[in-house]
């Protein structure tokens, strides 16, 4: 029987959207994608080089409305013909678009990114995959939420069975290497949003684990630094029982995590630029394995967190599960084998 082919739309061509398009192009055959459509709000002269590069690879790029850019397909033209939507806008735009998507009876599914909480079931690859199978709308949690949840998962168990409590400090880079809008000139501390959980990172981890019926006693704080390279997280995890395996053994058995003996984020970032597809690192987090503090029932340390590479991998996984892609486990294993590394 011939496998179904999908027409997909990437709505938003910022950092996440364009990086996602590159992944979809690379794995177009494996994901059974017939056509990739994309929507961009505006077309400036200095952006046309990249647009033309993507168009040369077969991506059909339209605009948000028929009147905004002449002679280009609009979102209105594309919505009736696509099977799946990768919502890559931010700052509440995706939540506004959800109202339209919910009226599309033919639409198999859609996913949105970290800032669009409430778009659907909060999701991260390797954590709650069973909860989004055949779900129409999924919210892929942020890159730093990925990092925090992955550390809890590897050291305390998939259901957090060995977690007593945890505290994490997220050290954020201020802006992607290719942008400048959100750069800061000095360290900026984030406001705690919850008197117990702290910043949105722990709130989002807690809410994601609620989809599994699991309580997550996690607190987080957040500081943004004048860096454009990688995030980092300092973790302090209190265990119910001491680890029965070494951290190295645990991480080796968790394909979404990686290790490094390097202390400089710029060195790790440069390796990703050289050897990662699209110059990116896709692990949920990279643990500084030679710098852990372990005492009885406590494990403390640092991990680097890639920018949006980890969320892109979860976004691809969400698509597979939402549309019930044929042989999705085998396809995802191939993608993970291609993109993930044991050490950096």
Q: What are the language-model segments listed below?
A:
Residues 11, 15, 19, 80, ...:
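Conserved active-site and cofactor/substrate-binding residues in soluble primary-metabolism enzymes
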Residues 2-178:
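N-terminal Rossmann-like NAD(P) cofactor-binding subdomain of oxidoreductases
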Residues 121-127, 145-152, 176, 201-208, ...:
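Low-complexity, flexible helical/coil segments
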Residues 31, 93-96, 258-262, 326, ...:
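Secondary-structure transition/capping residues
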